[in-house]
C-alpha cells in the first residue's frame, strides 16, 4: 500500500532530467502533489501516521528506494543550480519543503478550511493550483 502511495506522489518528478526547464518541472511536480492531496487525502494521513510512529513498515523503503529517489532528484536540481538555471538552494531541503507544503492540504484539511473560512476543500485546491501555474 505505501509503495503505491509513494510511487503516485513522486511519479511526475521521477522522469525529470537536467534538460527539462526547472520552473516547469517544479511547478508540474507541485501541482501534481497538490492534486494528490485533493484526490487521496487519506493516503497522506496514513503515511503521516506511519512516519510519526517511527516508520515500522516503511523503514527499509525509506533507507533504500526513497533515499535513492531523493538523491537522484537532488542531483538533477544541483545541475540546474550549477548551470545557473535555478536559484542556489539545498535540493534535498527543497524536496522536503514541497512534500510538506503540498501534503499539508490533506493532513491538515480541517485547519485549512477553518482558516480560509471555506465550506469546500476543493475550492482551495483549485485556487492554489491556479496560483502555482502563474509563478
Predicted segments, located by residue:
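All-alpha amphipathic helical-bundle segments outside canonical DNA-binding/catalytic cores
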Residues: 24, 60-65, 82-97
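Helix-loop segments that flank and shape redox-cofactor active sites
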Residues: 18-20, 53-54
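Amphipathic alpha-helical segments used for helix-helix packing
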Residues: 38-60, 108-115
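C-terminal peripheral helix-coil segments that are non-catalytic and often amphipathic
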Residues: 35, 39, 67, 71-85, ...
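Alpha-helical structural segments
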Residues: 1-16, 24, 28-35, 60, ...
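Active-site micro-motifs of SAM-dependent methyltransferase domains
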Residues: 8, 53, 100, 104
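Amphipathic alpha-helical segments that line or abut small-molecule/effector binding pockets
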Residues: 23-52, 92-99, 130-134
Amino acid at each position: 500500500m505505501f509503495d503505491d502511495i509513494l510511487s503516485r506522489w513522486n511519479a511526475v518528478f521521477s522522469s525529470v532530467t537536467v534538460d527539462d526547464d526547472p520552473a516547469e518541472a517544479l511547478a508540474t511536480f507541485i501541482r501534481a502533489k497538490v492534486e494528490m492531496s485533493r484526490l487521496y487525502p487519506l493516503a497522506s494521513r496514513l503515511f503521516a501516521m506511519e512516519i510519526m510512529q517511527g516508520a515500522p513498515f516503511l523503514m527499509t523503503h525509506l533507507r533504500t528506494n526513497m533515499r535513492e529517489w531523493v538523491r537522484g532528484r537532488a542531483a538533477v536540481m544541483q545541475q540546474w543550480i550549477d548551470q545557473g538555471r535555478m536559484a542556489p538552494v539545498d535540493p534535498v531541503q527543497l524536496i522536503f519543503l514541497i512534500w510538506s507544503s503540498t501534503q499539508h492540504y490533506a493532513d491538515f484539511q480541517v485547519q485549512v478550511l477553518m482558516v480560509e473560512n471555506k465550506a469546500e476543500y476543493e475550492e482551495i485546491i483549485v485556487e492554489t493550483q491556479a496560483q502555482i501555474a502563474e509563478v
